[in-house]
Amino acid sequence: MYVNDEGILTSEFTLTDRHQGPPGHAHGGASAAILDEVMGLVVWAAGHKVLAANININYRKPLPLHQPLLAEARITEVAERKIISEGKIILPDSTVAVEGSGVYVIASRFFEKAIMNGANS
């Protein structure tokens, strides 16, 4: 995973049999989890401590198992207490298979309190 100079986070991955939904293809929940992860991570990489408030996923094509796939995410809006990001999963032929957007709320106090109470240690 890396974030380029334009703020786009990119991650290459391959789904396996344990991610299967329909025969030979990924379960939709696996796709949603991947997009939630990259859409949230691009916000964290920009220095914001956030929690997901809403994610929206649009399935365009099924994701094949055992093939290299690409996930990308970028921040599209920064407001006072919320940040919106968008993500997509791209097939080997460059077709966008799954798209999503996420609304993340800034929750710095939540994380500061958790750290002071010994969480994540």
Locate the predicted segments by residue.
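Hydrophobic beta-strand-centered segment that forms part of the acyl-chain substrate-binding groove
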Residues: 37-70
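A conserved, well-ordered hydrophobic junction motif at loop->secondary-structure transitions
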Residues: 10-34
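HotDog/MaoC-like acyl-thioester-processing domains
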Residues: 63-65, 76-121
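Non-catalytic linker/capping segments at the edges of enzyme domains
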Residues: 1-12, 16-17, 120-121
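Hydrophobic core residues within well-ordered beta-strands of beta-rich domains
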Residues: 7-9, 51, 69, 83, ...
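Conserved positions in beta-strands of structured domains
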Residues: 2, 58-60, 72-76, 90
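Hydrophobic residues in beta-strands and at strand termini
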Residues: 13-15, 59, 106
